[in-house]
Amino acid sequence: MIGATYDTLILSDIHLGSEVSRAQDALDVLQTYSYRRLVLLGDIFSDLNFRRLTSEHWKFLSYIRKLSNPKRQVEVVWVEGNHDTGLANLMSHLVGVPVYQRYVWEYEGKRHLAMHGHQFDGFVKKNLWIGRLGEWIFLQIQKVDSRTKCVSRFLDRMNTRWLLLSDKVARGAVRDAQIGKCERVFCGHTHVALSLICDGVEYYNSGSWVDARATFLTINQQGVEIQTYAGGTHHRCPSTERKPVAAEAADLFESAGLPALAGYQSLRC
């Protein structure tokens, strides 16, 4: 079933590999709407350990590769986030899309800038190892959390509020947009969906796909909208779905002409 038609869809912070990733719901959005451009705005992966990807996560990646086929006439862009840093070369081959740190395009006479937003997060930049430790602790909590992952999602929301990231990222993004003479700027990273106008620049945050409220952005001639996923959350036990090498993973690597998945199972020790 095809829903509304848009020029651009923007999704961020899907965190493939995380127990709370709503990859199936994100895939549902991609398959429901019609669009000319798809911007994956960073942190598509939770980390660089492919062994944590479930069958649903591989299906999401496989669909991205299908969208990148020129016959689809969809421009697919991957903007690098702090969690998927280091995957640019592999992802450009695996799913067939270009990877950027900053992406600029024009639509309806306005310059648009997309960047993940971690560039304005001083804590992430200055405390890399503390951040890695926090990721590991959060992973352990996810493993023992209930089926609905209520505790994990609550901690994720509180984490972004403790760091006061939302306002900090917005201010930094607006400054960058002004320097680049862009009228609109889009970020992720904070997991908090937001829209505001500051000094003549429209700022939008696409939210995340790890919370009970999953959000994404749409752009058409009427403007930019924050959309909330209307379907239900797919509750399941991801740890029971992990296989040594999922069939979807093997097919994806083969279609990309890359060596077997085993060589990439963990890109960060």
Place the predicted regions along the sequence by residue:
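Mobile, glycine- and charge-enriched loop segments
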Residues: 1-20, 130-163, 240, 245-246, ...
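Core catalytic region of metal-dependent phosphoesterases/phosphodiesterases
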Residues: 2-7, 16-107
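Active-site-proximal beta-strand elements of phosphoester/diester hydrolases
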Residues: 7-15, 111-118, 202-207
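Divalent metal-coordination and catalytic microenvironments
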Residues: 13, 38, 43, 64, ...
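Active-site environment of divalent metal-dependent phosphoester hydrolases
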Residues: 16-19, 45-49, 79-89, 119-123, ...
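Conserved catalytic scaffold of divalent metal-dependent phosphoesterases
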Residues: 77-181
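Binuclear metal-dependent phosphoesterase catalytic core
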Residues: 107-108, 197-269
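Extended, basic/helix-rich recognition subdomains
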Residues: 162-221
